[in-house]
Amino acid sequence: MSVIKMTDLDLAGKRVFIRADLNVPVKDGKVTSDARIRATIPTLKLALEKGAKVMVTSHLGRPTEGEFKPEDSLQPVVDYLKNAGFNVRLEQDYLNGVDVKDGEIVVLENVRVNKGEKKNDPELGKKYAALCDVFVMDAFGTAHRAQASTYGVAEFAPIACAGPLLAAELDALGKALKEPARPMVAIVGGSKVSTKLEVLNSLSKIADQIIVGGGIANTFIAAAGHNVGKSLYEADLIPVAKELAANTDIPVPVDVRVGLEFSETAAATEKAVNEVKDDESIFDIGDKSAEQLAEIIKNAKTVLWNGPVGVFEFPHFRKGTEIISHAIANSDAFSIAGGGDTLAAINLFGIADKISYISTGGGAFLEFVEGKVLPAVEILEKRAKN
């Protein structure tokens, strides 16, 4: 993917506008999960080291355009950066210009409060562009949205480039999907086939094997002719599951863990996949299945992981996801993981340092895997050509 990279540019004395993803959870004015801020800090440090006049902005939550409310403010992010040792201030009224001193970071208030942000109003894009000499797109998590701060500004800024985070994300996804080392194994979990159908279709053309988990696996179990009892599955997508299974190596679990109700205290019973009763629900794969899948992962050279294989939030139905998580962690394969539940599992099992690349994007990650063009990346490619 040919985009200009921030790392290659001379930024000395230049006004640099960084679109980051600082959309973090906030409670009582305090940041409760700082992962996205921590991921952005190296970009901010690099811009300062290069002698740039640094502005950074992001969306936060879902504010109403044109109506600023205190709970929509990036102030908690500013407080976090101050505590991390940065010379930083918040600018609320910036669309007509902002003065940035050497060595300081100016955080521009929540972009989604600006009228025209979401619909990519070109006039707003031009106002953002007028603030800078260089626009840096570093928010992979919003790269699938063509908005004024992700697309419009990139059209009109003198130079538009990819920040280190975005560049790393594109490199990692390209490595996993464009020319993967083989065998390539994809793990796709989640509650519904319908929400991951395009992902499954796209991966069926790339992966040597697809491991399915969660409610998705239940639909494949039903497609293989087994009773799934009261399990979450999609009867109308059984023909689709059969077609995918006929054209791709998708191993169906040989054993499962079932319960009588969806609750943390429900007793778990392990049994063969063909022994599920009408009043039971499948909430996890069994030990034999987990070990078989771990063996597949062990032999892989590329692993793409999106979604757990069971209800890992409940201790009784955690083991399948735990075994697979450790198989990925202990594998020599290039591994890339993405999606909220996947990140929660990675944190739960303490394996973050053993995954080659952890994607910061949810929807953008899935759309890239589906083979879709990400608008914010497309405009950077166009600008690189010109």
Swiss-Prot record:
What are the UniProt keywords, alphabetically?
ATP-binding, Cytoplasm, Glycolysis, Kinase, Nucleotide-binding, Transferase
Spell out the disulfide connections: none
- Matching Gene3D superfamilies, A to Z? Phosphoglycerate kinase, N-terminal domain
Its main localization is: cytoplasm
List the pathway annotation: Carbohydrate degradation; glycolysis; pyruvate from D-glyceraldehyde 3-phosphate: step 2/5
Q: Which GO terms describe its biological process?
A: gluconeogenesis; glycolytic process
SUPFAM superfamilies from the entry?
Phosphoglycerate kinase (SSF53748)
List ligand-binding residues for ATP: K196, E313, G339, G340, D341, T342
PROSITE patterns documented for this protein? PGLYCERATE_KINASE
Q: Name one GO cellular component term.
A: cytosol
Which reactions appear under catalytic activity for this entry? (2R)-3-phosphoglycerate + ATP = (2R)-3-phospho-glyceroyl phosphate + ADP
Q: What is its EC number?
A: 2.7.2.3
Q: Where does substrate bind?
A: D21, L22, N23, R36, H59, L60, G61, R62, R112, R145
Q: Where in the cell is it found?
A: Cytoplasm
Q: Which GO terms describe its molecular function?
A: ADP binding; ATP binding; phosphoglycerate kinase activity
Q: Which InterPro entries match?
A: Phosphoglycerate_kinase (IPR001576), Phosphoglycerate_kinase_CS (IPR015911), Phosphoglycerate_kinase_N (IPR015824), Phosphoglycerate_kinase_sf (IPR036043)
Q: Which domain of life is it from?
A: Bacteria
Its assembly, as annotated, is: Monomer.
Q: Which family is this protein grouped under?
A: Belongs to the phosphoglycerate kinase family.
Q: What is this protein called?
A: Phosphoglycerate kinase
